[in-house]
Amino acid sequence: AASDVYKRQVDTAIILKAVLDKDIGLRDAKLLSHVALFEVPGFDRLLLVTDAAMSIAPDLEAKKEIIRNAVKVANAIGAENPVVACLCAIEKVNPKMPATVDAAALVDAAKSGEITGCTVIGPLALDNAISVEAAKRKGIADPNAGHADVLLMPNIETGNALYKALVILAGASTASLIVGAKAPVIITSRADSEQTKINSIVLALATAAKKGENN
């Protein structure tokens, strides 16, 4: 069986069609999602961002699957109980802002055991998710605020913008995968650097190896 899939110059749609084929495909989980790993200069830990490329406007159930997929990658890089922050514009639930409602529901899902292997926090703005000092200044009581290992995006626009901001403005090194298949799928952009492509292969191998340990 395949341990990882790399698209090279093949069109992304062709790769995904093959992965999702009901008879010969590699689909494993309920949903395929994109997970990006960043090493940001000056930041004290690796950071995972999901989903910046696959899930356009995920609903609550899709977000649960996106978290489960991201946890598998987090485990592969050594984060055994990652903190997953549900990113929003504010820190309080506002019915007019659906992402905050979903965030609260995802926190409850983790507390009830529906989502396992991680701690889910939110709703949180980006600064309070990754900076302890910012969380303290805002008076956020959650002890995990500022300690996020995984950033859950409310939609693809937010994820895409954050991905490019980290790479272009912050000079981050990155790797990315499609997760949720029987093997991690490497779908990099033709604009990505050679180092990003190499990083993605290494991350795919680590994720596949961790999956093998758990099977």
Where would I find each of the regions flagged by the language model?
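C-terminal functional extensions of proteins
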Residues: 150, 157-158, 162-165, 171-215
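Active-site rim loops that border cofactor/substrate pockets in soluble metabolic enzymes
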Residues: 89-150
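Short, acidic/small-residue loops that bind anionic groups at enzyme active sites
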Residues: 17-53, 119-121, 172-189
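Short Gly/Thr/Asp-enriched flexible loops that form oxyanion-binding sites at enzyme active sites
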Residues: 10-26, 98-100, 163-172
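Flexible, glycine/charged-enriched surface loops at secondary-structure junctions
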Residues: 78-84, 113-123, 210-215
